[in-house]
């Protein structure tokens, strides 16, 4: 059984903005977040502002740290009834 490959690339920009808003709301700088997730501050800047895709591990660390539900970004047509923060 062959799995069809979807060639669309996920637009990370909205999640990046959600991470930025959550980081700012917590009073954390890009430099502090970069230190915590072991990345360069410019990498955090690119993730937040330019929609650059982080590694899965970095992505997971950031969304769990700020309690960001990603369902609304991956499944925009579905309403997830979860009690997690909606930052955007």
Each model region followed by its residue ranges:
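Alpha-helical DNA-recognition elements
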Residues: 46, 50, 61, 79
């Amino acid at each position: 059984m062959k799995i069809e490959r979807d060639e669309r690339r996920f637009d990370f920009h909205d999640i990046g903005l959600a991470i930025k808003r959550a980081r700012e709301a917590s009073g954390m700088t890009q430099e502090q977040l970069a230190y915590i997730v072991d990345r360069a501050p410019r990498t955090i800047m690119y993730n937040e502002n330019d929609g650059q895709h982080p590694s899965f591990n970095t992505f997971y660390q950031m969304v769990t740290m700020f309690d960001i539900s990603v369902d609304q970004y991956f499944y925009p047509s579905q309403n997830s009834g979860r009690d997690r923060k909606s930052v955007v």
